[in-house]
Amino acid sequence: MKLNIAYPVNGTQKTVEVDDEHRVRVFYDKRIGQEIEGEAVGDEFKGYTFKITGGNDKQGFPMKQGVLLPTRVKLLLAKGHSCYRPRRSGERKRKSVRGAIVGPDLAVLSLVIVKKGEQELEGVTDATVPKRLGPKRANHIRKFFGLTKEDDVRDFVIRREVTKGEKTYTKAPKIQRLVTPQRLQRKRYQRNLKVRNAQAQREAAAEYAQLLAKRLAERKAEKAETRKRRASSLKA
């Protein structure tokens, strides 16, 4: 069985091949989310605590949280479910998934280091992989660098170098939700436009109501005139 060990603190991970079945037997009958002492796996993991996060069986079917079985099952999966990515809107599909209980049929078991042990693990705890991309949203940049609202966020955007052919240049993401004078001016314009449109609609409605009242009065007067003429003709 292969153990895929991840250390989120440093952003590293490494796959370790374990040929001795007795060493991985400690994981059997354990579920996703449970924690295991690393000393039971080997002396190099003394003091470590691992958390089971998933895995794949020998045929490549992924483990699914919540399926309390050590075998494969077929489930009707939709958008939002793990182990399935819908290709069309509203699509559902019956897929084979592996249960969340660890067994000997697994090819890869994913672990996360919850507690670091005495020895350093080569390529995992002794190395650091920096984040390639920094925060994009203005508030997230402020939180990341501990800035106040008075500080200019644009000076703190994390830029990265890009080499295209022989030319090297820096690239920065577009800051989202950045409040600038142009944005405030645009908001003011939109608000004023909304007020003007509402005012124009009210004026048009008042004008229409006035015209309608005038037409009704004319029709009423016309009917009264017709009745008057008819009455005078009957008298004659």
Swiss-Prot record:
The keyword Ribonucleoprotein applies. Coiled coil: none annotated. It holds the Pfam family Ribosomal_S6e. Keywords: Phosphoprotein, Ribonucleoprotein, Ribosomal protein. The modification Phosphoserine is found at residues 232-233. GO terms for molecular function: structural constituent of ribosome. Phosphorylated. This is Small ribosomal subunit protein eS6. The gene is RPS6A.
